């Protein structure tokens, strides 16, 4: 067994001899930085300057939320006012609604125009009726001329031409039919070109196969038949000439 080390207290004059006139304060490690003591006061807010996300950050978030809320309220009020005084159409159907409005506007203008012409119509009829007695004394062949002119002028004012315009639905239907016709024409053209290409490839392969069969002919000994090859070359030269 290993010898047991005796405790210092059993040594003669152990503790007393070691501690005579020596202070233990001077034996601290000077390389270790001493931690300063700070009282743990209760903080008024969560977080600190080093950790972040404290009082200033929470205040900033609160201000941002209030600002965004105010912007939403203003935007909502603005859209409600716009919806009262303006017509908002979807983007994909906007051109149809605008065309319909333009058509109604033109029709209203045409309706107002004939009304203003009808006001002048009685005046023209009165002029014609006044002019008739004056022309009765003249010759018979001169008499119908002013009446015809009056009738023509009255008819020209009273009978407006009715220009039947197409509705937006009819225009959309025509556009759709045109698009379908273009697509069908493109499809037919594609099919025609495809058939021509396949036919050309088939003819090319057939021709190549015939040439291969001619040039691949061999003699009984298994050697290439040069006579057949020379005949083929002469035939090609004659065709080119």
Curated annotation (Swiss-Prot):
<keyword id="KW-0805">Transcription regulation</keyword>
<keyword id="KW-0539">Nucleus</keyword>
<dbReference type="GO" id="GO:0005654">
    <property type="term" value="C:nucleoplasm"/>
</dbReference>
<keyword id="KW-0804">Transcription</keyword>
<comment type="similarity">
    <text>Belongs to the TAP26 family.</text>
</comment>
<feature type="compositionally biased region" description="Basic and acidic residues">
    <location>
        <begin position="186"/>
        <end position="202"/>
    </location>
</feature>
<protein>
    <recommendedName>
        <fullName>Thyroid transcription factor 1-associated protein 26</fullName>
    </recommendedName>
</protein>
<feature type="region of interest" description="Disordered">
    <location>
        <begin position="182"/>
        <end position="205"/>
    </location>
</feature>
<dbReference type="Pfam" id="PF08524">
    <property type="entry name" value="rRNA_processing"/>
</dbReference>
<comment type="subunit">
    <text>Interacts with NKX2-1.</text>
</comment>
<feature type="region of interest" description="Disordered">
    <location>
        <begin position="1"/>
        <end position="22"/>
    </location>
</feature>
<dbReference type="GO" id="GO:0003723">
    <property type="term" value="F:RNA binding"/>
</dbReference>
<comment type="function">
    <text>Component of the transcription complexes of the pulmonary surfactant-associated protein-B (SFTPB) and -C (SFTPC). Enhances homeobox protein Nkx-2.1-activated SFTPB and SFTPC promoter activities.</text>
</comment>
<dbReference type="InterPro" id="IPR013730">
    <property type="entry name" value="Fyv7/TAP26"/>
</dbReference>
């Amino acid at each position: 067994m290993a010898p047991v080390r005796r405790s210092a207290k059993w040594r003669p004059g152990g503790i007393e001899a070691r501690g005579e006139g020596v202070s233990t304060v001077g034996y601290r490690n000077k390389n270790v930085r001493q931690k300063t003591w700070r009282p743990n006061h209760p903080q008024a807010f969560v977080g600190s300057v080093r950790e972040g996300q404290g009082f200033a950050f929470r205040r900033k978030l609160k201000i941002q939320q209030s600002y965004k809320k105010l912007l939403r309220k203003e935007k909502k009020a603005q859209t409600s006012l716009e919806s009262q005084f303006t017509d908002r159409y979807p983007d994909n159907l906007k051109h149809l609604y605008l065309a319909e409005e333009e058509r109604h506007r033109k029709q209203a203008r045409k309706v107002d125009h004939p009304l203003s012409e009808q006001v002048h119509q009685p005046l023209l009829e009165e002029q014609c009726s006044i002019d008739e007695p004056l022309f009765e004394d003249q010759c018979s062949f001169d008499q119908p001329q002013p009446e015809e002119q009056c009738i023509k002028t009255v008819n020209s004012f009273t009978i407006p031409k009715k220009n039947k315009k197409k509705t937006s639905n009819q225009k959309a239907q025509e556009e759709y039919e045109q698009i379908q016709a273009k697509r069908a024409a493109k499809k037919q053209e594609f099919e025609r070109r495809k058939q021509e290409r396949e036919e050309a490839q088939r003819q090319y392969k057939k021709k190549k196969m015939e040439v291969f069969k001619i040039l691949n002919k061999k003699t009984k000994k298994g050697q290439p038949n040069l006579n057949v090859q020379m005949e083929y070359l002469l035939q090609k030269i004659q065709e080119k000439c």
